[in-house]
A protein has these predicted regions:
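Long, contiguous hydrophobic alpha-helical segments, chiefly transmembrane helices and signal peptides
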Residues: 54-56, 101, 157
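Helical "lid/coupling" subdomains associated with nucleotide-phosphate turnover
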Residues: 21, 59-83, 87, 100-110, ...
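Gly/Thr-rich phosphate-binding beta-strand-loop-beta motif of the actin/hexokinase/Hsp70
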Residues: 9, 14-44, 146-178, 231
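Intrinsic structural disorder
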Residues: 1-7, 135, 162
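N-terminal glycine/serine-rich phosphate-binding loop of ATP-dependent small-molecule kinases
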Residues: 2-11, 16-22, 26-32, 36-97, ...
Length: 271
């Protein structure tokens, strides 16, 4: 996740004895590695970025723990990342994990296996740390202040949960944490052998129920901007509008039209 990389880079960039830095993030859907070079105190160059698909959330949010096969696959992936880091002669590194480990009953076992197999000490971030990092990353962008001066909803979508923060007239009104993440919904509703249309209807009804109280209390008025925070937000932007991908913005009407087009496609066509 880019937000965590930003945090780790800030920590490391103050020490100019470090020339090459690696950051690993263990997420709900994948494990990723980024390697950076510090050219001076202000210039940071990304050397490599590798993502390995691994659905840890499929176990963690449906069974309550991460299965042995997924633990093996995770350790193998991290061992490969370690070899890549050695090839770059990395001076320092950080390894972070999201709620996918924090919510797993066998978190300590997984962390122990990672350490025994790779030597990595993984830092599992709390929900508050995770959200703070995400919003700090967004707040650092030039357009953020302009957006919140009228009204905006920052929606942080994760595998375990979503968090919605409402801004009006430059002030933070509320932040609400709702356990309706992508993997949680999929594990709850996604494997029942029902037709796609009925599946979509159930998701819509489920989300409406979860958001009912929130809308009644905080959404009597609409918002001018929606700030989407997600692992795949930029990929989504690129699919909707190439120009939107470049400036990280897309018109609401275009977003709605894109979603309507998806509703007429099968899951295979979408993926």
């Amino acid at each position: 996740m880019a937000d965590f990389y930003g945090l780790m880079l800030k920590k490391e960039s103050g020490d100019m004895a470090i020339h090459t830095f690696a950051a690993i993030y263990i997420g709900t859907y994948d494990v990723s590695l980024k390697v950076f070079e510090f050219l001076d105190r202000k210039k940071i160059h990304q050397v490599d970025h590798i993502r390995s698909r691994l659905d840890l959330g499929q176990d963690a949010f449906s069974k309550g723990s991460i299965g042995y096969e997924h633990v093996e696959e995770l350790c193998d992936t991290l061992a490969q990342f370690k070899e890549i880091m050695q090839s770059y002669r990395v001076d320092s590194y950080e390894v972070y994990a999201s709620a996918v480990l924090r919510d797993a009953e066998n978190e300590l076992f997984v962390l122990d296996q990672i350490y025994l197999r790779t030597g990595f000490k993984v830092k599992v971030v709390s929900n508050s740390e995770h959200r703070f990092i995400s919003y700090k990353s967004v707040a650092g962008r030039d357009t953020f202040e302009k957006m919140i001066q009228t009204s905006a909803a920052a929606v942080d979508v994760g595998g375990a949960s979503i968090q919605i923060t409402i801004f009006r007239d430059g002030k933070l009104i509320t932040t609400q944490h709702i356990e309706t993440g992508i993997m949680r919904i999929f594990n709850l509703l996604g494997d029942r052998g029902m037709p796609q249309q009925k599946y979509e209807t159930q998701i819509e009804e489920y989300m409406n129920k979860k958001l009912e109280a929130f809308r009644a209390m905080y959404m009597e008025e609409s918002v001018d901007y929606v700030i989407l925070i997600s692992d795949y937000a930029m990929e989504l932007m690129k699919r909707i509008d190439e120009n939107g991908h470049k400036d990280r913005q897309v018109k609401g009407e275009k977003f709605v039209r894109y979603v309507e087009k998806l509703q007429n496609k099968t899951l295979e066509e979408i993926t």
